[in-house]
Each structure stands twice: as C-alpha cells, then as structure tokens.
Amino acid sequence: MEYSVVIPAAGQGKRMRAGHNKQFIELGGKPILAHTLAVFEQDDWCTNVVIVANEQEIEEMGELANRYQISKAKKIVAGGRERQESVFAGLKALSQDGLVLIHDGARPFVTEKEIHSLVETAAKTHAAVLAVPVKDTIKRVEGEAVLETMPREELWAVQTPQAFDLALIKQAHQKAENEQMLGTDDASLMEWLGYSVAVVQGSYFNFKLTTPEDLLFAEAILAEKERR
C-alpha cells in the first residue's frame, strides 16, 4: 500500500512559550519535526511528504529536511492563518489519487505499526483516525458550573495521523472554504460532508507536544527508547 502525507508545521506553538516555532525545539539533540519526518522517511509505504510551513520559514524547513536526509519531502508550501487553511494548501500540492495522511509535526512518537493499521482501514472506508479512549472523567462546564458529566465510555481523544481518500478530503476542504466553515480537525470536515469516519485505536505515546511539560515527557520517552 502507498500513501502521501501532509505535515502542517506552520503553528507558532504559543503554549510552549519558546518564542519561536516549536517544530525547531530540540528533542534528544535534533528538532521535534526531524523526529516526526523520520518516521515517514523510513516507512516504505510513504511515497511523498508535503511540509506546510510559515512563509518566512520555508527555507529553514528545507534546510532541516536536507540536514536530516528527508528525501521524501518533495514540496514545502506556505500555510495560512488557520491550521485548516494550511492543511488545504498542503493537499492542493498533491496531484495523484490515492490515500493521504494528515499528521501534526509535533507528534514525533507515532509508529509505523499504527500508521499501517490506519492506512489499511482508510483504504476500505475512505476516512479513518487514530484515537485513544479518554482516561479522565469529562464534564461539560459553563463559567464555573458543571452542566453535565459526559459518559466516558463513549469518549475518545482523537489524534493524528488522520487518513483520507485524497479527492474526498480535498472536496471537504474546498466546501468548507467556500462556506467559511472551520472544523476542529480534518475528520470533522468529512463528517460535515456526510461521510462516516472509522476509528483505529492508537497509543497514548502519540501525544502532541504542546506545553513545556509535554517536552519533559517526550525527553523521558526518547531516553527510554534509546535504552532499549
């Protein structure tokens, strides 16, 4: 099986409080994004990587890809103000049919096994996401008051990559752009268009590095992986 992947890496990561794009923050001696790109570079099923960057960081992203020998990163395109705009820019850089994955640049711990399970499911269903059951009790809150406690057994935390038929997800993004609809993730656009989205159970290790605390966890995970 084959797939392409779009990696949005244009966000500034304000919650990381690093003062610059968190993709360039070092994790175990190399940028977070380099770890993420390496997963797809090493996967034989992946044929093409599109990186979506801030316009002023395109050259720096290219240098990063060259430095870490990411030969599949054939295109680096400028993103938009919102993540959704950036993803659509990446999708428009792909011309061939088939499956496309959309994966956060700041999720460096996704595994090839998880990717392959996702791709195999999406090949049958046209849309699939990685997700994990929530561990905590989730309450719906308004102001400082609890409105209701959500049934935890029904709740899953959705991750990336998310996998789609390329033509369908392009159609969903185009319709969303035309109607100024902003989804919470790419799968929500497919749902909005009327398609069902399959769920593939992922791993709690595949978390998004968003805060300084996440970076501490990531360093610990990387150190443990290197000891094995």
UniProtKB/Swiss-Prot annotation:
It is an enzyme of class 2 (transferase). Belongs to the IspD/TarI cytidylyltransferase family. IspD subfamily. Keywords: Isoprene biosynthesis, Nucleotidyltransferase, Transferase. InterPro entries: IspD, IspD/TarI, IspD/TarI_cytidylyltransf_bact, ISPD_synthase_CS, Nucleotide-diphossugar_trans. This is 2-C-methyl-D-erythritol 4-phosphate cytidylyltransferase. It comes from Halalkalibacterium halodurans (strain ATCC BAA-125 / DSM 18197 / FERM 7344 / JCM 9153 / C-125). Signal peptide: none annotated. It catalyses: 2-C-methyl-D-erythritol 4-phosphate + CTP + H(+) = 4-CDP-2-C-methyl-D-erythritol + diphosphate. NCBIfam families: ispD. SUPFAM superfamilies: Nucleotide-diphospho-sugar transferases. The record marks R152, K208 as: Positions MEP for the nucleophilic attack. The record marks R15, K22 as: Transition state stabilizer. GO terms for molecular function: 2-C-methyl-D-erythritol 4-phosphate cytidylyltransferase activity. Catalyzes the formation of 4-diphosphocytidyl-2-C-methyl-D-erythritol from CTP and 2-C-methyl-D-erythritol 4-phosphate (MEP). One of its GO terms (biological process) is isopentenyl diphosphate biosynthetic process, methylerythritol 4-phosphate pathway. HAMAP family: IspD. Its EC number is 2.7.7.60. Pathway: Isoprenoid biosynthesis; isopentenyl diphosphate biosynthesis via DXP pathway; isopentenyl diphosphate from 1-deoxy-D-xylulose 5-phosphate: step 2/6. The gene is ispD.
